[in-house]
A protein has these predicted regions:
Chain B
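Short, well-ordered beta-strand elements
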Residues: 53-64, 85-90, 112-113, 162, ...
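Helix-loop-helix "hinge/cap" segment bordering the ligand-binding cleft or interdomain interface
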Residues: 80, 86, 137-138, 155-222, ...
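Short, low-complexity disordered leader/linker segments with a strong preference
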Residues: 1-58, 80, 430, 437-445
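C-terminal capping/gating helix-and-loop segments adjacent to ligand/active sites or protein-protein/ligand interfaces
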Residues: 386-438
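Extracytoplasmic/periplasmic substrate-binding proteins
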Residues: 222, 249-339
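Extracytoplasmic "Venus flytrap"/periplasmic binding protein-like
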Residues: 76-146, 181-184, 280-284, 289, ...
Length: 327, 445
């Protein structure tokens, strides 16, 4: 939009450069035009306001109340910071869900990105049929947060599941992975890692952008495959890595579906899969403590925002933009 | 809306090619945007159907296809007798039902009549969502004269009749008859002590190669019966009816059972702890017994080809009571409250309707009609559950109070603590202490 070159003030919404003499007349038109703009925006705007912005603000208000869903709004009591206080001082299951979510994200996200990058490197060649392979590797992430996939996962990784039958071929006795509190979360991590298709596709696109002359120059300087990867590929790819890292971290923190399905919505066995969002859901809808759940949601939002800020502020130390200057 | 804009007044002589058309289009769009919600509102008003003299009662329940068909037939019957009343029925699976009910309530638009169970009755009653039916009962508009008094009492919260029992059930220990006969093992009987039950299960494990009993230490209904046999209860007023010592004893009882091989391994116990009927170990073949409700027998039977038997939980059977398997409640703010009460009265007391509904929601609450239904039924599994429940009814003890606010959390905490002990991550004493502390927090808030 900003790229429109023709300076046509009647068609641009912001026309502060116009001569003052004609302001009155154009003002009306601008008004009409602006109105038209809003009318055309309205489907999106109503959606944003009604479904996102207003409920979000309401939840901020609710986070300072003892709202329990069933009590009418008029009888809701303002409790100040009590919900936040309770979260940090006297709710062991909240802390537990924070730990579960952190360990999930800290392990699953880097491994997922590594898998995506590794496969992207393998698939970044001109083999015949490589397109089909890319498609196949991308397939799992198309199924995204699907419930069906989580159900398949549960059946693959229980005691009688396919994975244990596979292990049995090598004489290894498997575990009841999804029903073992020591392994249930790890099973979810594997599921998340397996769905590396989306970042893989982005990595592939990034790899194609790396100029071949850089590799040629490196070869001339006598760099081996590893040196080329470390000194050419990684720096050139760093903006893409950064993008994927931010996105996948946010996704990782918000994992819900698989944990919900695997544990029948309880976070079990023994809270081992009690992800933050699942805990939030149980608090709000099963325990009916919607005010407290709202406070949890806001702490979560702020935490994710902080992490993203940290990413962006450290990015300048390692993200290299190829247009000559590091931003 | 706006003063007419003269086209020639536009800057640098530019004119709109078709200003009028544009403006008209614009106005049309605006009108459409403004009017859309109005249309929606008008449609919503139409739902009340006040215009054609008919009243529409909304009704919401959880359950499967079979229940939906039976209920729809019973409601059709009501419409036949009262042509001015029609129904807007909504039903869904149990999972997610209470989320939806809570959301509907929050939106100020709950159904006139809804199905609810003892896990949530107190939550809703305490917040005045449910209509107190006492007034209708006193006026004779709601006939409860044929109800067992304890069953009726189990719908009373804080002195208000918050829900009308839609059916009665009680705890039932279901065992795999085929497996026992095949291995020449004795069938368990009502009145066996807990120790005898565990010893029996150990024997089954050894001879049949299938764990004798599911470890029910995570199951609040088994824990509850056991507590009542110790002279305690799950709740006492607004407090817990038990102590850490009681829970420790309960967990230790089952630790012993696990150690002696009477139960499956912890991961299998965990599978069986799911409330889903299809996952009960007695039908998945992973254990010889499961701890369920008697009225779940026909449903369990559908999931296995083996023959099943059902008895009371171990110990003194008088610890069991006539539990309302579920209730019908009326929304307090319903515009058609009187009619809604008449409908639930019909569902409970009309001979034809009760016959149609059968034992799908538990044994009919109306004792006269219960007899008729049990004489008529041909489904062997249903017949069996009716017989057992009728027999148990002879020894039923007094109903406990309806579980208090925070009960769903207490249930979840019991599962967590018991599984902690089962997986060996905590000793029975540690798990018990953790459970009681979590419960106190849950019911305090």
């Amino acid at each position: 939009m900003a790229l429109t070159t023709a300076p046509d003030p009647t068609r641009r919404g912001t026309g502060s450069v116009r001569p003052p003499a004609t302001r009155r007349g154009t003002g009306r038109i601008r008004h009409a035009e602006g109105l038209a703009g809003y009318v055309f925006l309205s489907p999106w705007l109503i959606g944003l306001m009604g479904i996102t912005a207003i409920p979000m603000l309401l939840s901020l208000y609710l986070s300072f109340t003892n709202y329990d869903i069933l009590t009418p709004w008029s009888e809701v009591e303002w409790v100040g910071l009590a919900n936040y206080e309770r979260m940090f001082t006297s709710d062991p299951s909240w802390w537990h869900s924070v730990r579960v979510t952190l360990s999930f994200a800290l392990i699953a996200v880097p491994l997922k990105l590594a898998a995506a990058l590794g496969v992207a490197l393998l698939l970044n060649r001109a083999w015949r049929g490589v397109g089909l392979l890319r498609g196949l590797f991308y397939l799992p992430s198309l199924l995204g947060g699907s419930v069906a996939l989580a159900i398949v996962w549960v059946n693959m990784f229980n005691r009688e599941g396919a994975f244990n039958s596979f292990l049995a071929l090598f004489g290894i006795e498997g575990k009841p992975w999804v029903n073992d509190p020591d392994w249930a979360l790890e099973t979810l991590m594997v599921l998340a890692i397996w769905q590396f298709g989306a970042p893989m596709v982005i990595f592939l696109a990034g790899l194609k952008q790396v100029p071949t002359e850089l590799y040629e120059a490196a070869s001339v300087d006598g760099a081996g495959k590893f040196r080329k990867f470390v000194n050419v590929t990684l720096p050139m790819l760093s903006p893409v890595i950064f993008f994927n890292l931010v996105l996948e971290t946010i996704n990782g923190f918000q994992g819900f579906t698989a944990a919900f399905v695997l544990s029948n919505g309880t976070g079990g066995p023994v809270d081992s899969t009690l992800m933050y969002t699942l805990n939030l859901y149980i608090t709000g809808f099963t325990d009916l403590e919607m005010g407290y759940a709202s406070a949890m949601a806001w702490v979560f939002l702020i935490a994710i925002a902080l992490i993203t800020v940290v990413f962006f502020s450290t990015g300048r130390f390692w993200v290299h933009y190829s247009d000559g200057e590091d931003r | 809306m706006h003063p007419a804009t003269h086209p020639t007044s536009a800057p640098d002589g530019r004119t709109y090619r078709t200003p009028l058309l544009r403006r008209r289009l614009l106005r049309g769009l605006l009108a459409a945007v403004v009017a859309l919600p109005l249309v929606g509102a008008a449609a919503a008003c139409g739902d009340d159907g006040a215009s054609d003299g008919k009243t529409k009662i909304s009704i919401f329940w959880w359950g499967g296809d079979a229940r939906a068909q039976l209920t729809a037939q019973a409601l059709e019957l009501y419409t036949k007798k009262n042509p001015d009343v029609t129904f807007e029925t909504t039903w869904q699976a149990n999972q997610g039902y209470f989320d939806k009910l809570a959301t509907l309530t929050a939106g100020g638009n709950p159904p006139d009549i809804f199905q609810i169970d003892d896990n949530f009755l107190a939550e809703y009653a305490a917040r005045n969502v449910t209509l107190d039916l006492k007034k209708y009962q006193d006026a004779g508009d709601l006939d409860t004269t044929k109800f067992p008094p304890s069953l009726l009492q189990y719908g009373v919260v804080d002195g208000k009749l918050a829900g009308l029992a839609a059916g009665e059930n009680t705890q039932g220990l279901v065992y795999n008859k085929t497996l026992l006969t095949k291995n020449g093992l004795p069938e368990p009987t009502t009145g066996m002590s807990w120790e005898e039950h565990i010893a029996w299960a150990e024997q089954v494990s050894k001879k049949a190669g299938v764990p004798g009993t599911q470890d029910p230490s995570a199951d609040y209904k088994a824990f509850w019966v056991w507590l009542r046999q110790q002279g305690k209860d799950l709740y006492a007023g607004s407090d817990l009816g038990f102590t850490v010592e009681d829970v420790t004893k309960w967990f230790e009882l089952w630790k012993g059972a696990r150690d002696s091989g009477a139960t499956p391994t912890p991961d299998v116990i965990h599978e069986g702890n799911a409330t889903d009927i299809t996952k009960q170990l007695v039908v998945t073949g992973k254990s010889a017994t499961s701890w369920v409700w008697v009225n779940q027998m026909p449903e369990l039977k559908k999931n296995t080809s083996d023959e099943l038997g059902v008895i009371a939980y171990p110990g003194d059977p008088s610890a069991q009571w006539a539990r309302a398997s579920m209730y019908w409640s009326v929304f307090r703010g319903s515009k058609n409250a009187d009619l809604a009460v008449d409908v639930i009265n019909f569902l409970a007391n009309d001979p034809e309707a009760v016959k149609l509904l059968g034992t799908d929601r538990g044994l009919p609450s109306n004792m006269d009609l219960r007899r008729v239904v049990s004489d008529d039924t041909t489904d062997p599994a249903m017949k069996q559950s009716i017989e057992v429940e009728n027999k148990l009814a002879e020894t039923f003890g007094e109903s406990p109070q309806v579980p208090i606010k925070g009960h769903s959390k207490v249930r979840a905490e019991l599962t967590k603590a018991a599984e902690n002990a089962q997986y060996g991550r905590a000793t029975p004493a540690e798990a018990a202490a953790q459970f009681v502390e979590a419960c106190k927090a849950a019911i305090a808030s």
